[in-house]
Amino acid sequence: MPKRELWPAGSCSEPVTHIGSCGSMMSTTSTHSGSSDSSYDFLSAEEKECLLFLEKTIGSLEAEADSGLSTDESEPATSPQSFRALPTTTQRAPQGKPEARDTQQVPVPVPKRAAQSSGPPESPSPGLRSGSYSLPRNLHLGRSQNLRKSATQTNSVSEAPEVFLEEPKKGQTRQGAKTIQPPAPSQEGTPDLNTVLIPPPEAFQDITSKKAEGESPPKKPGEQTHRPQGHILERSPHSQKKADMSSETMTHKATEKGWTEGPQRPQQPPTQPSQNTQAEEPSLPSGVKPNIQQSLLTATKPRRLPPNIVLKSSRSSFHSHPQNWLSNHTEATDSGPVSSLQEQRKARREALEKLGLPQDQDDPSLPVNKHTGSFKVKEAQAQTSSQARAPAQPASPALVRGTASVAEKASSVKAITPLDSLSKGWIPAQETPPGKVGAAKSMPIPIPKASKENSSLTQSKPDPRLTLQESSIPGLRQMNFKSNTLERSGVGLSSYLSAAEKDPGGQTSTSLGKSPFLDKVSSSVFRNSRPRPASLGMGKDFAGIQGGKLVGLEQGQCSQQPSFKGQSHDKLPRPPCVSVKISPKGIPDGHRREALKKLGLLKE
């Protein structure tokens, strides 16, 4: 807002009522002890209630000051001292009321530092007046000029408090010069105060300043008139102590920043309050900083909470959000190890079903093979997670993410065929606190303890584990595409493995290794290992059919079939004539030949 030119430039235009937080409560009580009682004449019942409420809040504000918060922003700027100045002229008291109420709208009250400037403030009136023309750097500004500047400075919270901090001293200084100050300009000033004083926009207000605003507008009219000398005396020792500490530190900052006290220095007493106000000015940004830091700290806490919420989501969230498991393993996995075994088994079954491998082999062998393998996986990951735990819980989530990414890479390497399900299944168990893991697991292997003991070996171990499981995998990998044909033809994996153990060298006879394997399956495995369905009849029924004609015919068909279908061995992995050999006893040869012709297997 533009500065008001209605105000006379002289400091005389500024009424005595402007004793603010910068003016010490002690000095106001000493100078205005006689006049303070008359201030109660202006008070309504509501204002008195506001006074009591303010006095209650003082303790909390002082506690904030002790905690390191800036008290500049937490208390109303125009303290009762201003009204104690009022009674000098009967007109000024009512005039002071609206001014005080208007000024209270500005959110930066700093009564606690008033004690510092308590002694000197009355003398510096000439210096203050001379400095009042300058911008808020000259901390001793007249109320009228402060109001102008506050209008321009409402954009920033820090400047507005500076203005009001300065004013009270002037009020005190003008207490000495009360005769000089005519009430008429103050009357003129009051309407301008009503128009000029505007609180800064919310974007520029601090949280504490907003609280102060909420407290101040009701409080201050009562507050300024109400506060008895006793209350002021009560506050003053606290404010003096805090002001002394803040003034020492803040004056150094102010001198470093090179605050220009200009015309105010010719008299040393004004310079001291100027330093105090300077201390208050730098303290305002410093006060803003703790609020910002606290808001950041409080913001980081909710950032830690969402992982707790995510932990209870689906198991796949570990790979998408690995830091959730690592950082919050304790919470999610109290019940994890018991359920993880079941979930692991379920996942392994699903993986085997997808691979087309029968589950019969899982039940006898996997508790030995794959559980040990999964424990190796879990041991590796548990050790990596145990390393991750030590930094992860005290450290920032970045460390958690880093360790999580390591564990994620390890699990991704392991996640081949059913092992992916294993890694998912064991992640909660591995990340339970090691003590809980050992107790909760139904499996007897004490790996989590080893993870603590061998935490130094963690990085070296995962490689042999990976190689061990990958070494066991290649056999499974060779069977992956074959398992599709096995699933179609119904041949069991266990029967194939038993046949492979008996005759390991026969698999590599042909290029793809398909037909010899399936011939072997059709002959030794298919007939011997699987119980024969009753619907097909007994094997003896097929022995003497047609005097062996069918056998010769079928052999001829087998010899003709490659030429007939061309690339049948390359394209079709299933062995020739397997379906033809199975024929019930009573079917005549004619029907059989017709069926073979329809199938294209019999060539005339």
Swiss-Prot record:
It holds the Pfam family SARG. GO terms for cellular component: cytoplasm. Residues 208-259, 343-353 have a biased composition (Basic and acidic residues). It is found in: Cytoplasm. The modification Phosphothreonine is found at residue 333. The modification Phosphoserine is found at residues 132, 134, 396, 411, 522. Residues 20-41, 64-411, 424-484, 497-541, 553-592 are annotated as: Disordered. Keywords: Cytoplasm, Phosphoprotein, Receptor. Residues 20-39, 117-132, 380-411 have a biased composition (Low complexity). Residues 68-93, 143-158, 311-330, 556-566 have a biased composition (Polar residues). Putative androgen-specific receptor. Belongs to the SARG family. This is Specifically androgen-regulated gene protein. It comes from Rattus norvegicus.
